[in-house]
């Protein structure tokens, strides 16, 4: 009879990280907030759409605020205290996401805009006619 390897239940220990980075991707349609450690390994993330907002309500500053709060609360389990913030994109949730992370209790050490700017690359979308 073959011996079945026993799978003993091991408690998973969460690594403790004091300093982290918050990547805020604010597009016109959604806002994605990811909190990582210094090496870039994701600790927690949240989106406006995943926070219960659908359609045009995803692209509001309030939806970005809720997403940033959810990502920030989830990252507190790892012991993150200080955040360096990287903001990408022109969306409406840029500032409100930063303010929400500050309100959760993080000390924001640095804010950097990493929006990619083309050196005359792809053709942009046509202008809207309303």
From Swiss-Prot:
SUPFAM superfamilies found in the cross-reference section: Translational machinery components
Keyword Chloroplast: no
Gene3D superfamilies cross-referenced by the UniProt entry: Ribosomal protein S11 (3.30.420.80)
Domain of life: Bacteria
Gene Ontology terms describing biological process: translation
CC annotations in GO: ribonucleoprotein complex; ribosome
Keywords associated with the record: Ribonucleoprotein, Ribosomal protein, RNA-binding, rRNA-binding
Subunit structure: Part of the 30S ribosomal subunit. Interacts with proteins S7 and S18. Binds to IF-3.
Family (UniProt): Belongs to the universal ribosomal protein uS11 family.
Annotated protein name in UniProt: Small ribosomal subunit protein uS11
Species in which this protein is naturally found: Shewanella frigidimarina (strain NCIMB 400)
């Amino acid at each position: 009879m073959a011996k079945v390897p026993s799978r003993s239940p091991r408690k998973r220990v969460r690594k403790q990280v004091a300093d982290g980075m918050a990547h805020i991707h604010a597009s016109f349609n959604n806002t994605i907030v990811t909190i990582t450690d210094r090496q870039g390994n994701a600790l927690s993330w949240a989106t406006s759409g995943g926070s219960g907002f659908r359609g045009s309500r995803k692209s509001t500053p309030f939806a970005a605020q809720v997403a940033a709060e959810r990502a920030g609360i989830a990252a507190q389990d790892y012991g993150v205290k200080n955040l360096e913030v990287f903001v990408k994109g022109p969306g409406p949730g840029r500032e409100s996401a930063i303010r929400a992370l500050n309100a959760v209790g993080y000390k924001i050490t640095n804010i950097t805009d990493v929006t990619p700017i083309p050196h005359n690359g792809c053709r942009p979308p046509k202008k809207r006619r309303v």
